[in-house]
Amino acid sequence: FMQKVLIYMNKLIDFYFDFISPYSYLAHKKILNINERKNFNYKAILLGGLHNLGNITAPAFNERKMKNMREDCNLIAKKNDVSFKWNEKFPINSLYLMRGYLFIDANKKDKFFDTCFDAYWKENVDISKEENIKEILSNCKIDQKSFITGIKNEKIKNELKNLTNLAFEKNIFGAPTFIVNNKLFWGQDRLEYALDEFKS
């Protein structure tokens, strides 16, 4: 029995995300609402890079899918009482912020994560613009000079590339994706299934 408890305590749900994914934002808000953040290991990937690897056309580049996605996200947000506003600057290049998430200190990651997501999917901010990135850094008390140097560091560049490649190798094709016990759950509507597996 004791061994099972220890295994349960050490196990986390891997959550693959990109700040440009509205469904990742909605999934994260659900996680906060049910106070489960401690059980998730957030893994940054570059969604555009993942789509290129898998030769996938994102919904953002298909007019009908895009229209459906906007309506779908609004429905999910309303149903779950989540503050959400479709960003007029969708999609953007999230490369610098995704690298930034990997670069910053562990104790600043949660604040940075929440601030980026809220800026883009709640406050309609274009988080690819330099002045808006600077404001995010200021709100998170992150040094701008070290951040700008950090995101150009080869180690950080390669880390994001490797995480994205690894996600592709694990058959991940979109965000959010949850992996627990080597089982893959794709989409914010599969969050409950991932949690069930985690607690089984």
What do these predicted ranges mean?
Residues F1, I20, G49-N52, N93, ...:
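A broad, structure-centric signal for solvent-exposed, well-ordered loop/edge residues
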Residues F1-Y8:
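Short, Lys/Arg-enriched N-terminal segments with co-localized hydrophobic residues
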Residues K4, L97-Y101, A167:
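Short, charged low-complexity linear motifs
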Residues N10-D14, D18-N41, K111, T115-S200:
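C-terminal cap of thioredoxin/glutaredoxin-like
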Residues Y23-E123:
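Structural alpha/beta surface segment adjacent to cysteine/selenocysteine redox centers
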